[in-house]
């Protein structure tokens, strides 16, 4: 079964302590993740940071096209709270949406994501293959990823082991830039 997957950068201004966008970053990693799953799952990219979406606008986006999986990329520790807010918004729309946190913050400081009841999975390390395998598992096609994914359930965190570095970058597809809305 194909999943409806939304990949997103949260708006850093959702964190009460941050008053402005520090930078607009090209969604390279979201494009790469999208390319890894695009042939098997329906995927879109939401750049709430670049588009300066409010939580309410983000919520409407999810209501109009509800995902089965929301992948949240948090690119620096200072913005962890924005990622958690994105997961909260998604779970308010539909508690069955599977939320997945990834990015630098999930690798270097996963504690806020582990403590949030709105984050279901955490991808740690180079997550291209781990995220693809997690989506396939959630769609009923494959086993839980052997490496790189933390899962929360029954009051404890279950890890699937440390992900290996991707040694041959030429094996990765080109990012799915056609999914990025350049205004």
Positions of the model-derived regions?
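Extreme N-terminal starter segment of soluble prokaryotic enzymes
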Residues: 2-5
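Proline-centered helix-kink/hinge sites
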Residues: 10, 26-27, 67, 110, ...
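Glycine- and acidic-residue-enriched helix-capping/strand-helix junction motifs
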Residues: 16-30
């Amino acid at each position: 079964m194909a999943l409806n997957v939304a990949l997103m950068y949260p708006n850093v201004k959702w964190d009460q302590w941050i008053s402005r966008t520090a930078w607009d970053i090209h969604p390279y990693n979201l494009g790469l993740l999208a390319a890894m799953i695009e042939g098997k799952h329906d995927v879109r990219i939401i750049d709430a940071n670049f588009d300066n979406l409010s939580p309410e606008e983000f919520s409407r986006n999810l209501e109009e096209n509800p995902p089965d999986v929301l992948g949240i990329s948090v690119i620096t520790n200072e913005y962890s709270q924005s990622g958690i807010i994105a997961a909260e918004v998604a779970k308010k729309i539909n508690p069955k949406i599977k939320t997945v946190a990834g990015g630098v913050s999930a690798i270097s400081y996963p504690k806020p994501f582990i403590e949030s009841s709105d984050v279901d999975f955490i991808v740690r390390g180079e997550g291209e293959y781990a995220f693809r395998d997690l989506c396939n598992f959630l769609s009923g096609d494959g086993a839980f990823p052997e490496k790189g994914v933390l899962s929360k359930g029954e009051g404890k965190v279950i890890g699937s082991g440390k992900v290996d570095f991707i040694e041959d970058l030429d094996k990765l597809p080109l990012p799915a830039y056609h999914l990025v809305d350049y205004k």
